[in-house]
């Protein structure tokens, strides 16, 4: 098959993050994007491209040139098998180097500054991402994702459905079979035959199956399989069931008191779970205050971590909750929020639930932001919150940070299974990526309810101790931190 496309135009499937890279390469190669098919988005997308229909519409476009932009290997395979008899073309950057002796199949992505060297073979529907190098005599199967800056030595054989993480190295003469995930920065020094997740240098297997990491009930069935098709949400009475509400707090006593005073007003609707990262104010002030709320039954549970592990506290608390008490049959919805918010609409819970139930393709609803105290002068990156999103009638399609995130509990469990399987952490950017690029669903935010971000008031003062702490410890957000915690509960 020809390495480069002879088509003058192409249709794309799915409008996610990887699609933007694909669009850049096709347009740089002079290939017109005739339209994009996506089940969850409409209208204009990136660089003037248009979403013109849903995936089922592709049956009307048989024999036309197509490219699937999905990053997930399994979903890419499913789409390739269900859209009918289209012509799958390759997307190859002009800035990639491919030896004339290389044999390439169909539906492959080869990104900028990547290299495929002498006598190598690349099957179908693979992603060779930016800066990756496949040296001589490699044999690559189908539906693999070779992430940016991966280096693969000579005579390596890679099967199907593998993910080789960013900046990984695969030594020469290695076999990587099927359904293997290699973590970022790993070094593969011997062949990997058993499916699973491998990390480190040299890489070692850390988990056998995706579902092993996050199981809950005594029969040990993975929740991912047991509850994904749960129909209990169809009963509108579930709207009145209590909602577990995870609130993460840290250090700032006045802000914590304002936030928890706000949320505890709704404890007839919320089972409030406070998560605290230990700080200098914990023992003297914060812990006594939170324990008083617990004793008065204004909150349900209190996780106290012995160190400041940033957003990993969400991750560890949710892991524990899923294994012990977060039952989707009892709690159809779960709320997760930062502990520095107040919300200006007393009906904010109902608004978020109504948004979730108005469209089955909505994955998460969150509160919009009150930007009146946005610290744009001291934190220029905060300007990202000024974006307006797309007005969809009763909601705005757009993401936020972790500002009152409402999800179906089954989706929280599904998300945690995914994050654990990829050795990732609970971050808003990763939730957004999973929402759009794996679930093909929508992140919605409220039109009426707005969250006031109390910490932003502090960020306006660069000399404030909390602002300095955030600046000095910003690197911690990228660290996989863990520690022990105490759990206090009613």
Curated annotation (Swiss-Prot):
Protein name listed in UniProt: Uncharacterized protein L142
Family affiliation: Belongs to the mimivirus L137 family.
Pfam families: PglD_N
Extent of the signal sequence: 1-19
Matches recorded under SUPFAM superfamilies: Nucleotide-diphospho-sugar transferases, Trimeric LpxA-like enzymes
Domain of life: Viruses
UniProt-listed InterPro entries: AcTrfase_PglD-like, Nucleotide-diphossugar_trans, PglD_N, Trans_hexapeptide_repeat, Trimer_LpxA-like_sf
CDD domains: LbH_AT_putative
Organism annotation: Acanthamoeba polyphaga mimivirus (APMV)
Cited PANTHER family: ACETYLTRANSFERASE, UDP-N-ACETYLBACILLOSAMINE N-ACETYLTRANSFERASE
Keyword annotations: Signal
């Amino acid at each position: 098959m020809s390495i480069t496309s002879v088509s003058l135009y192409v249709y794309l499937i799915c409008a996610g993050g990887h699609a933007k890279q694909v669009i850049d390469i096709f347009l740089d190669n002079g290939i017109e994007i005739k339209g994009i098919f996506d089940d969850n988005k409409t209208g204009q997308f990136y660089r003037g491209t248009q979403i013109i229909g849903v995936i089922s519409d592709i049956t009307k476009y048989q024999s036309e040139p197509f490219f699937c932009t999905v990053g997930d290997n399994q979903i890419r395979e499913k789409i390739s098998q269900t859209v009918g008899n289209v012509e799958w073309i390759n997307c190859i950057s002009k800035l990639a180097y491919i030896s004339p002796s290389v044999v390439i199949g169909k539906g492959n992505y080869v990104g900028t500054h990547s290299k495929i060297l002498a006598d190598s073979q690349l099957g179908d529907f693979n992603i060779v991402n930016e800066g990756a190098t496949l040296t001589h005599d490699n044999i690559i199967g189908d539906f693999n994702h070779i992430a940016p800056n991966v280096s693969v030595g000579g005579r390596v054989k890679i099967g199907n459905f593998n993910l080789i993480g960013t900046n990984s190295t695969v030594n020469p003469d290695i076999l990587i079979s099927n359904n293997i995930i290699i973590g970022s920065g790993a070094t593969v020094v011997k062949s990997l035959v058993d499916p699973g997740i491998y990390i480190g240098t040299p890489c070692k297997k850390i988990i056998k199956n995706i579902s092993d990491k996050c199981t809950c009930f005594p029969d040990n069935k993975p929740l991912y399989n047991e509850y994904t098709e749960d129909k209990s949400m169809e009963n509108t009475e579930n709207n009145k069931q209590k909602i577990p509400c995870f609130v993460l707090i840290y250090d700032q006593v006045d802000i914590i008191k304002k936030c928890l005073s706000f949320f505890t007003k709704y404890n007839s609707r919320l089972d409030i779970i406070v998560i605290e990262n230990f700080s200098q104010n914990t023992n003297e002030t914060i812990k006594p205050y939170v324990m008083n709320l617990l004793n008065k039954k204004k909150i349900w549970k209190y996780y106290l971590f012995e160190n400041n592990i940033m957003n990993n506290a969400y991750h560890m608390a949710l892991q524990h909750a899923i294994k012990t008490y977060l039952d989707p049959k009892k709690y159809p919805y779960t709320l997760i929020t930062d502990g520095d918010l107040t919300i200006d609409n007393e009906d904010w819970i109902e608004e978020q639930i109504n948004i979730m139930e108005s469209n089955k393709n909505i994955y998460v609803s969150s509160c919009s932001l009150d930007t009146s105290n946005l610290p744009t002068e001291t934190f220029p990156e905060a300007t990202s919150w000024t974006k307006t999103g797309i007005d969809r009638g009763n909601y705005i399609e757009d993401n936020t940070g972790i500002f009152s995130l409402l999800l179906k509990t089954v989706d929280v469990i599904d998300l945690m299974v995914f994050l654990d399987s990829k050795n990732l952490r609970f971050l808003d950017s990763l939730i957004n990526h999973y929402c759009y690029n794996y679930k093909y669903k929508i992140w919605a935010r409220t039109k009426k309810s707005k969250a006031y971000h109390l910490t932003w008031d502090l960020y306006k003062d660069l000399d404030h101790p909390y602002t300095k702490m955030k600046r000095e410890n910003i690197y911690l957000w990228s660290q996989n931190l863990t520690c022990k915690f105490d759990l206090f509960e009613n």
